[in-house]
Curated annotation (Swiss-Prot):
GO MF term list: structural constituent of ribosome
Transmembrane segments: none
Start and end residues of each stretch annotated as Disordered: 1-21
Listed InterPro entries: Ribosomal_bL27 (IPR001684)
Protein name: Large ribosomal subunit protein bL27
Gene Ontology CC: one annotated term: cytosolic large ribosomal subunit
Annotated gene: rpmA
Length: 89
């Protein structure tokens, strides 16, 4: 009887967990300072008024307001936060 013994170990069979990237707050949504708007690798989106960019390219709000996405130079997509007018006064 032919038997196969002591086969080599496989080098496959592992995977890394997803990094949970993407847009977290969409156009028109209200944000407060510190809210993460986009998690990304590289600069798929660029910061404009009312937002900042972290060292891992995360775009976050720096002011209260509503998120807007718009195209700019070199066909880049910019994200800004436009302050909402205080209607309470």
């Amino acid at each position: 009887m032919a038997h196969k013994k002591a086969g080599g170990s496989s080098r496959n069979g592992r995977d890394s967990a997803g990094r949970r990237l993407g847009v977290k707050k969409y156009g028109g949504e209200a944000v407060i300072p510190g809210n993460i708007i986009v998690r990304q690798r590289g600069t798929k989106f660029w910061p404009a008024a009312g937002v900042g960019m972290g060292k891992d390219h995360t775009i976050f709000a720096t002011v209260d307001g509503a998120v807007t996405f718009h195209k700019g130079l070199k066909n880049r997509t910019f994200i800004s936060v436009l302050p909402v007018a205080e209607a309470a006064e």
